[in-house]
Curated annotation (Swiss-Prot):
Function: Protein S19 forms a complex with S13 that binds strongly to the 16S ribosomal RNA.
GO CC terms of this entry: cytoplasm; small ribosomal subunit
Signal peptide (from-to): none
Entry keyword annotation includes Thylakoid: no
GO process annotations (BP): ribosomal small subunit assembly; translation
Family stated for the protein in its record: Belongs to the universal ribosomal protein uS19 family.
Name by which UniProt lists this protein: Small ribosomal subunit protein uS19
Keywords: Ribonucleoprotein, Ribosomal protein, RNA-binding, rRNA-binding
Matches recorded under PANTHER family: RIBOSOMAL PROTEIN S19P FAMILY MEMBER, SMALL RIBOSOMAL SUBUNIT PROTEIN US19M
Amino acid sequence: MGRSLKKGPYCDPKLLKKIEELNAKGEKRVIKTWSRRSTIFPQMVGHTIAVYDGRKHVPVYITEEMVGHKLGEFAPTRTFRGHGDHTERSTALK
């Protein structure tokens, strides 16, 4: 279920403040954030934001196609390592 249109998109105020400060200075540096729920705004395009995935910060370079999506969509929390292999024991039981 999406967010109500009358409320508008959400972005962490501290993150937005950091982005605006960097834009004013013209700097490009990695910004660490734990706010996976923040919506990507046009001001963020061109910046690299390190999004926390529960274990480490994953660097995400923001492009124009990402605007409107959430930061958490680009930092997966689960690592799929594949299903179990067939062993001698499992094939012998059949």
